[in-house]
Regions:
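A broadly tuned preference for mixed-charge, low-complexity surface segments
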Residues: 21-29, 84-87, 123-135
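Short amphipathic alpha-helix that is part of the acyltransferase structural core
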Residues: 1-14, 48, 102, 109-148
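Acyl-donor-binding surface of acyltransferase catalytic domains
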Residues: 52, 56-126, 139
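A general structural signal for short secondary-structure boundary/capping elements
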Residues: 93-95, 146-149
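A short helix-loop-beta-strand connector motif used in the catalytic cores of GNAT acetyltransferases and
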Residues: 18-24, 71-72, 99-102, 149
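N-terminal charged segments
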Residues: 1-69, 83, 140-142
Length: 149
């Protein structure tokens, strides 16, 4: 029997946060602030999770202070499901630029879409070695990545 699970966009955001953890994660005023020593933008950004109704100047200043204290650039990640026109305008007026737009594709997956396969289960150290080999990077430079896993 096929089971349908209803998820809202905020639940999906939190699932994404759990899938790619950050060293530090805090919430306030509709944002999830995440940092991991600059390893990826997703794990080092202010992520809007609900419509923002508070003072934008104060909110952006608090986010900027958070990243400044960690010697990181301020990156705001604003999913398309967030009503953010005023935040977008405020950030643009303060010299932020929109970069690296994401596109999420989805489709219904039928049970017959899957073929049996074997999965290799690896510990984090072995996974980093495989990732580094595939990516053509030095595995010894991946300590932060390993710490996140």
């Amino acid at each position: 029997m096929l089971r349908v699970i209803e998820l809202n966009f905020t639940d999906l955001e939190y699932a994404g946060f759990r899938a790619w953890p950050a060293s530090d994660q805090r919430e306030f005023d509709g944002f999830v602030l995440r940092s991991s020593n600059g390893f990826t933008k997703r794990a080092n950004s202010a992520n809007a999770i609900r419509p923002l109704i508070s003072d934008l100047k104060g909110l952006v200043n608090r986010c900027e202070e958070y990243f400044f204290d960690q010697s990181l650039p301020s990156i705001f990640r604003i999913p398309s499901f967030i009503e953010s026109e005023s935040l977008d305008e405020y950030l643009e007026e303060n010299f932020y630029e929109a970069k690296d737009h994401s596109l999420v594709l989805h489709r219904k997956i039928e049970a017959s879409d899957f073929t049996p396969c074997k999965l290799a289960v690896k510990n984090a150290t072995d996974w980093i070695a495989s990732y580094s080999e595939i990516s053509g990077i030095n595995a010894t430079s991946q300590k932060l990545h390993l710490d996140m896993l």
